[in-house]
Amino acid sequence: MAETVEELTVAYEDGGIQTVKELDKKVLTKGAWATLIFRYQDWNKTKGEYGPDKYTIRRYQKQNGEYRQKSKFNISSKEQAKSIIDVLSAWAGDD
């Protein structure tokens, strides 16, 4: 497990193949609880290529010096991401 927020990743390798490729990450909050958003792609074994961009928001809690994942929310498409952006922009817009 990761000891720092910077070490947290969604990248995953299985059998020498990177099945989850992390493209970017942003740290939203740091501390005993950390929130990060990741942009990533899954490996499509059938096609032999990476699929479309996906996004995930993950919450980690630091326990005994290591961050442990406590929750996640997966955003499976650009369309869903844009819908979330639209709603949050409307809710958090200027007063």
What are the residue ranges of the model-derived segments?
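Positively charged, low-complexity terminal tracts
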Residues: M1-K78, K82, D86-D95
